[in-house]
Amino acid sequence: MSYGEIEGKFLGPREEVTSEPRCKKLKSTTESYVFHNHSNADFHRIQEKTGNDWVPVTIIDVRGHSYLQENKIKTTDLHRPLHDEMPGNRPDVIESIDSQVLQEARPPLVSADDEIYSTSKAFIGPIYKPPEKKKRNEGRNEAHVLNGINDRGGQKEKQKFNSEKSEIDNELFQFYKEIEELEKEKDGFENSCKESEPSQEQFVPFYEGHNNGLLKPDEEKKDLSNKAMPSHCDYQQNLGNEPDKYPCNGQVIPTFCDTSFTSFRPEWQSVYPFIVPYGPPLPSLNYHLNIQRFSGPPNPPSNIFQAQDDSQIQNGYYVNNCHVNWNCMTFDQNNEYTDCSENRSSVHPSGNGCSMQDRYVSNGFCEVRERCWKDHCMDKHNGTDRFVNQQFQEEKLNKLQKLLILLRGLPGSGKTTLSRILLGQNRDGIVFSTDDYFHHQDGYRYNVNQLGDAHDWNQNRAKQAIDQGRSPVIIDNTNIQAWEMKPYVEVAIGKGYRVEFHEPETWWKFDPEELEKRNKHGVSRKKIAQMLDRYEYQMSISIVMNSVEPSHKSTQRPPPPQGRQRWGGSLGSHNRVCVTNNH
């Protein structure tokens, strides 16, 4: 290849640099760079990078605009070596794009960096996009480099290329090897034994005064092999240790996957005492209570809760056989219930006017407990268990206990319909109404002078049914005031009955005009309005038990004739009871 020369002249900082090539053939393995002389000389030089030195090849003569009609190529920036500085980083650098430079005919010396940037396929990719003409000759130049045809530098480049390729392969091999090792460690960790971590409540400070060091792996293996032999160290086992770990002179021996050794416990060695938080756990929910219903002492006071304590020990726990006098059953939030966590033996007044004796009352069920743990309520988990236990007992007692239902409402409000619905849910129930006193064989005849006798007669019938254990006992009266229901509630809680208050859910139950139309006994609107003025909306057992009968209603009345039959029939003919409204 022949040399070509381009004459150049410095025309100024904004003049264009033009060149006219003498030969258009250019190898892709060489790089041409145009450097500006920073000493303000009037020429540019084209240098070729061969090895580590820069060798000047040609001198560019910078001409004026007179060469524009020839085949010229504009140069806009100075192309510096790529590993030193990228094009465009300096404002005074002019990059030569597609400039053709004549080179020597002999094969040039090619540097390793140039080869990697331009021709190596093993490298990630070129940093800059090679010119189009260099792309055409890329395959041929790569073959020259790999085969080393008549070029000692090509052989060296091939060796260096192979060495770099091998280094990359080695790095990849090491990378994948590390990944495999990490995966193996992960699998081994998943397959290893997972020892459960003990809770903070289980730790017992028996390490005090000992050295809390861990055995070395060799000592662990030796100790594992000698576990079946008698040991001279003190054998200590308690709840504070982690599962299947044994302390020996203050040292903890971790167990292995094979649990056959951990279950071996020498019987000839002393065992450390079993230590738990203060107070043993509560008995399970399925312990039995020997409850004797309706077996209270003869003629008990109706305002006192009585219970007999007959405690016995079973499996280390106190289990009480409660002979209970069912004296109270309330759902009112004002009632006071004692807690088992406090040992109370005195008499405490309750919200319903009654007094309760001994420790625990829940929905009319008096439970006597000889032992109560003082720290029971302080323990979160035990408190939850106690709450579940109490709730379970309440639900069970709600099903087992007898029920007294007191209906309330003005005449025509729908009490009769509600009583039939409740009676239909349990055919063993019975309905009592004061209006039954005024029903005769020839029809209903109301007499206001007999109203007191009618109430006494109805209360006696209800008491007989409660004594017989009938449930539910439904009282279908207006019951607009609390004192009217007090006799029924006293008898019911004295026999351990639950007491509930029900009102019909009708939109007209407080509308005198509509009630006048709907009641069956012709009660006037004026009378209904007067009853509505006396109606007590809030009702509970405590309100009933604290109520007082008005003075004008407390006059002594003679008992009604015992042999007198009503339309509703006797107590045995409750299936034919006619449910009516009370005035």
Swiss-Prot record:
Is Oxidoreductase found in the keyword set?
Answer: no
Instruction: List keywords of the entry alphabetically.
Output: Coiled coil
PANTHER family (alphabetical): NEDD4-BINDING PROTEIN 2-LIKE 1, NEDD4-BINDING PROTEIN 2-LIKE 2
Indicate whether Coiled coil appears among the record's keywords.
yes
Sections of the chain in a coiled coil: 162-197
What InterPro entries does the entry give?
NEDD4-bd_p2, P-loop_NTPase
What GO MF annotations does this protein's record show? enzyme binding; transcription corepressor activity
To which species is this protein native? Answer: Homo sapiens (Human)
Locate the region Disordered. 549-575
By what name is this protein known?
Answer: NEDD4-binding protein 2-like 2
